[in-house]
Amino acid sequence: MATVQPIVNSHLSELDEDVFHHFGFTTKSFDFKEKFGDVKFVCVCGSSGRIHNFAISMAKLAGLALPVENIAGSHARFVLYKVDHILFADHGIGIPSTLILMHEVTKLLYYAGCKDVLFIRLGTSDGLGVKPGTIVLSDRCVNTKLEPYNELCILGKPVRRQTKVDSNAVNELKKLSENLSLKCSVVVGGTITANDFYEELGRLNGSICTFSKEEKLAFLQSVYDHGIRNMEMEGAAITSHCNLTGHRAILVCVTVVNRLETDEVTTSTDEFKLFEQLPGQLVGEYLKRNNGIIVR
């Protein structure tokens, strides 16, 4: 259960119609409680194609007819699918895009009357000291200063929001992984959420680099020694927003490079596609066992 009293935006009650600009619908498009009132889980990832494929796999597992309907409008920024008690959406790259999605999905859940929903990010990430193709279950999410906060600037003032993950769900997933025949390793560790792919993640191969190779390696080794096992760019947006809106969140990411060895993602296209599917194999079984779908 979520432990923080959720914040409700009182201004929403003043709206005759709330426009979900990035989903391409409004509160008058359909009855939110009827359409979404049974949602227990929200699965998100960066790519619209990847989340579509995961929604299809869950629909097949549930014995539902295909295709799955994209509920979002034809000119929407994001996609949105629903299979039984699960919503599926893409969040794009980085905190700004992800926060836009989080605002609109959590408003959707508010209008639908859904509480204590578990958000699951299925993503790709840089690994630290683990080989490519390893699933990292995040036991904490921190910024590049190793602080458990997502930092924003609202009306010119700095705001810090906690990035707590649902430790119970993390433990359940880890235990489940030990009983499945997954073709990968699953580890529990800390996750860094950075603001970009190059400089904040300590890469030497961006168009700008103001640090040496030695400084980079010292930083990466330091965060590894603090228990960090992967780095990405969205988790803090998801966890912090869930903490404020009365929901829970976990991060399930597969590593595509070991940053203690190289900056470059050199996996082949076929190997990368295989890696992308690994989080869904674990999460899909978890959703099935926790009544996310109804097997027909």
UniProtKB/Swiss-Prot annotation:
Extract the InterPro entries matched here.
Answer: Nucleoside_phosphorylase_d (IPR000845), Nucleoside_phosphorylase_sf (IPR035994), Uridine_phosphorylase_euk (IPR010059)
**Alphabetically, which GO biological process terms does the record hold?**
nucleoside metabolic process; nucleotide catabolic process
- Return the protein name: Inactive uridine phosphorylase B
| Entries under SUPFAM superfamilies matching the protein | Purine and uridine phosphorylases (SSF53167)
Instruction: Give the multimer and partner information.
Output: Homodimer.
Which species does this protein come from?
Schistosoma mansoni
Family matches, as Pfam families:
PNP_UDP_1
The portions of this protein that span the membrane are: none
Which Gene Ontology CC terms are recorded? cytosol
Q: Which family does it belong to?
A: Belongs to the PNP/UDP phosphorylase family.
The entry lists its GO molecular-function terms as: catalytic activity; identical protein binding
